[in-house]
Amino acid sequence: MVAFTSCTTKNEVKSSGINYDIMDTTVNPGDDFAQYAAGNWTKVSPKPADQPNWTSFTSISDKNNKLLGELIQGIASQQNEPGSLAQKVGDVYNMVMDSVRLNNEGLDPVRPYLDKINAIANNAEFIKYIASQHDNVLFSVGVGADAKDARINIVNVRQGGLSLGSRDYYLSDEAGTKKVRDAYKQHIVNSYILLGLDEKAATTKMETVMKLETEMAQISKSRLEMRDPEANYHKMSVDELNKLTPGYDWKQYLVDFGYDQTTEVQVSQIEPVQLGCKMLAKGNLNDLKTLYEWQTLSSALDYMSDACVLENFNFNQSRNGAAAQEARWKRALGIENRLLAWVVGQLYVEKYFPAENKARMEELCKNLIASFADRIDAQEWMSEETKKVAKEKLNSFY
């Protein structure tokens, strides 16, 4: 890496914007360029104990979160108009900060949801219920842009049912993945004990969850296979999907899900979705209820008592390596961003992003687009027609 300075007048010197403090110049850049360019980053900016990783981007995010924390703490400490955005944000923050109430309640707030699951009488009722709740038990359903026609949105159906995300965590015997798998098993047991089950009953629940998730993992696509866009795109009618999943009524499922006008879907991974449909339609009902119960319980842990939050943290340590829990106000901020992201964003903009800042950013973007247009004009290998199309695409940026 070479930096030049240029003299424009006798007294004016423009210098490079490169931060030499983070560079490790004792290393030959030809041997290890990453170490050479940023090897001293951890020395000048050590990783906080509550962070799983630390980069210049997470450093900026951390500074931004401190501003956001000050904003929300101020909102939460005042009387806000009932029904206002501020009132919603303040209520969520104060609820998370009320450790006495949360510890007294334990997992009681989630029990009514678990009771509804356990009251389901048959597989058809189970499918109808998970659709009405927009819950993805053995595959994922949602709306997004059509990968081959961004002008339209389409219902996407993808493989799912793996709480650990990757199939490798269930199937690989590599030391790192096995460590996570063993930690996950213990995490399930510990969580059910927090719910009030004894160790034997909790272990039985864990074995059921692992049986179903491992079965899904065996047919799920690997991370490498998921990178092939063509192999993960199968657009079809709902009738065609029904033929691929005998015994599973997609038309009714989509109506119950709230997508009653849907006639076409995009199925990313056909075989895992087929297995998920077969298991939901014809699988052991009690096993399905246990899996859904676990997914519901697991998703609630971060919102419950200190013991529940600590259990979640201890398990996640096996994957992310954070040495300490985040402060409660940071956890509250994270929950705000999960539940009320758009609201928090609006309040942040009102306080920290005035109109003149927006105008500056818009001017910067216009200058960038103009610069790119100049670069297009300078390309000798491009025909005039190609340049015209390139500029049309460029001018569509916003």
Question: Positions of the model-derived regions?
Answer:
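Contiguous, non-catalytic segments that form substrate-binding/exosite surfaces or channel walls
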Residues: 217, 355, 359-398
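Surface-exposed patches in mature extracellular/periplasmic domains of secreted proteins
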Residues: 44-49, 78-84, 196-205, 376-390
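Active-site-surrounding "flap" and adjacent substrate/cofactor-binding loops of secreted or lumenal enzymes
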Residues: 28-31, 36-100
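Noncatalytic, helix-rich "gating/capping" subdomain that lines the substrate-entry/channel surface
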Residues: 74-363
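Bacterial Sec-dependent N-terminal signal peptides
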Residues: 1-13
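Secretory-pathway/luminal and periplasmic proteins that interact with or process carbohydrate-rich
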Residues: 41-44, 164, 215-225, 370, ...
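Extended, non-catalytic structural segments that build the interaction scaffolds
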Residues: 16-27, 168-176
